[in-house]
């Protein structure tokens, strides 16, 4: 009888254990990252070797070209957001201006392949001889904000925002808006030194 009781208890225990695992599971809601950009303050970026200056967020860091370089490109890095604005500078002539403007429009259109809307906003600061266009690419774009600035005679400055990782436009929208506002500040405070 003891073997029979042992088998009965084992069978009963197995049924209890197996039936305890069956139950209604409650799905957990998806959690999304909430990004709270910091309150922004701007500082003047004025590097002696560069032919331009502008205001930049105190939370951004500027990557300069090597000291022995003849180029005037910079990168504006946002390490907290894994984002970077890649900026290039080109000396132009009145004859090459159209070529560079056309290239900027093509680059914006190429980045906007899967984008529903490209919003273009023109900027003009006659006092500082700065004219430009801001491109806002709404939707899934590798570069949601791009811009170009020129004096139409000697200087051409272009920038494009990229994230380090592939992002979902909706999830990263607060950061894109924050950096877009920094770019607008850059454009509005930009001037040529030479």
Q: At which residue positions do the language-model features occur?
A:
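Bacterial N-terminal signal peptides that target proteins for export
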Residues: 1-11
